[in-house]
Amino acid sequence: MFPLKKSLLLLFFLGTINLSFCEEERDVDQDERRDDPGERNVQVEKRLLRHVVKILEKYLGK
């Protein structure tokens, strides 16, 4: 019974953290919408480029 409670508590905790990150991301997106649309596109491209570079470094090595 205890391992089951422990697992459920862990899932609840991780779900809460994930929800918190989603809310923060949504708040950031709402702030970006108030800015110039062209500026927002540049910010999104920079974020995307950063993730692509990390993935390429992971597979190709440094």
Curated annotation (Swiss-Prot):
Tissue specificity statement from the Swiss-Prot or TrEMBL entry: Expressed by the skin glands.
Annotated TM spans: none
Could you tell me the Gene Ontology terms of the biological process aspect for this record?
A: defense response to bacterium; defense response to fungus; innate immune response; killing of cells of another organism
**GO cellular component terms listed in the entry, alphabetical order:** extracellular region; membrane; other organism cell membrane
> Mainly localized where?
secreted
The protein's superkingdom reads Eukaryota
**Signal peptide: which range, if any?**
1-22
Which of the residues bear the PTM Leucine amide?
Answer: 60
Query: Any idea where this protein resides?
Result: Secreted; Target cell membrane
Q: Which residues form the propeptide?
A: 23-47
Keywords for this entry? Amidation, Amphibian defense peptide, Antibiotic, Antimicrobial, Cleavage on pair of basic residues, Fungicide, Immunity, Innate immunity, Membrane, Secreted, Signal, Target cell membrane, Target membrane
Q: Tell me the protein family, please.
A: Belongs to the frog skin active peptide (FSAP) family. Temporin subfamily.
State the function annotated in the UniProt record. Answer: Antimicrobial peptide with amphipathic alpha-helical structure that acts against both Gram-positive and Gram-negative bacteria and the fungus Candida albicans. Is active against S.aureus ATCC 25923 (MIC=2.5 ug/ml), S.suis 2 CVCC 606 (MIC=15.6 ug/ml), Salmonella ATCC 20020 (MIC=15.6 ug/ml), P.aeruginosa ATCC 227853 (MIC=60 ug/ml), and C.albicans ATCC10231 (MIC=31.25 ug/ml). Is not active against B.subtilis ADB403, E.coli ATCC 25922, and K.pneumoniae ATCC 700603. Also shows a strong antitumor activity, but no hemolytic activity.
Query: What protein name is recorded for this chain?
Result: Temporin-La
